Regions:
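VWA/integrin I-like adhesion module and closely mimicked acidic/polar interface patches used
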Residues: 75-127, 131-139
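Phosphate/oxyanion-binding active-site loops and adjacent basic polyanion-contact surfaces
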Residues: 41-49
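Von Willebrand factor
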Residues: 1-22, 49-52, 68-72, 101-108
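Surface-exposed acidic, glycine-flexible loop patches that form ligand/cofactor-binding
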Residues: 54-65, 79-81, 90-91
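Short, basic/glycine-rich phosphate-binding loops at helix/coil junctions
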Residues: 26-33
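…and closely analogous acidic/polar surface helices at protein-protein or active-site interfaces
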Residues: 1-3, 22-26, 82, 86
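C-terminal alpha-helix
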Residues: 55-59, 135-142
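Second-shell loop/turn segments in exported
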Residues: 17-19, 33-42, 74-79, 100, ...
Length: 143
C-alpha cells in the first residue's frame, strides 16, 4: 500500500494536483500517515485516481504483488465527465489493482467513483477520529 495526497494547489513547481507521500509498503504506514493530513484545496479526485491507479498498475508489474489504492476524500470537483472518467479508470487500472474509498463528511459523493470502487465507506463526522481510523484502516487492509 502507498499513499498520495491530492487537492494540492498548482504552482510553477506543482503542475499536477497530487503527489506521493508514503512509498509502497505496509498498510499500517498509510493508516498512520493519513492522520496527519488536513483538508483544503480543490479536490481533483478523478485525475488523481486515474494517476494513482496507473502508478499502482506499474507497481504490480514491477513487484508481481497486488496493489491497493486507498482514496480518502471529502468530495469531487469534476475535472472529467463520467464517461471519460470510467474509460480512463478502465485503461489505467491493471490486473491486481484494487480501489478502496473512504468519504469523509457530508459533501456530495461522486456516484461514478462509488461504482468503480471495490469498497466504499462513509464517515459522516470527520471530527470522529475513531471512526476515521477504523474506516481508513479497513480500506487500507491493515489489521
Amino acid at each position: 500500500v502507498g499513499l498520495w495526497n491530492y487537492s494540492s494547489p498548482l504552482s510553477a513547481t506543482a503542475t499536477v494536483g497530487y503527489r506521493p507521500n508514503v512509498a509502497y509498503g505496509e498498510a499500517d504506514n498509510v493508516a498512520q500517515a493519513v492522520g496527519l493530513f488536513g483538508t483544503g484545496g480543490v479536490p481533483q479526485t478523478r485525475s488523481a485516481v486515474v494517476a494513482a491507479l496507473g502508478n499502482a498498475s506499474d507497481q504490480v508489474a514491477e513487484s508481481g504483488k497486488d496493489a491497493r489504492v486507498v482514496l480518502v476524500t471529502t468530495g469531487t470537483q469534476q475535472d472529467m465527465d463520467d464517461a471519460a472518467f470510467t474509460e480512463a479508470v478502465k485503461n489505467a487500472r491493471g490486473e491486481g489493482v484494487s480501489l478502496s474509498v473512504v468519504h469523509l463528511g457530508t459533501g456530495e459523493k461522486d456516484a461514478e467513483l462509488e461504482k468503480l470502487a471495490d469498497s466504499y465507506s462513509t464517515v459522516s463526522d470527520p471530527s470522529d477520529a475513531t471512526a476515521n481510523k477504523k474506516s481508513i484502516t479497513a480500506a487500507a487492509g491493515a489489521q
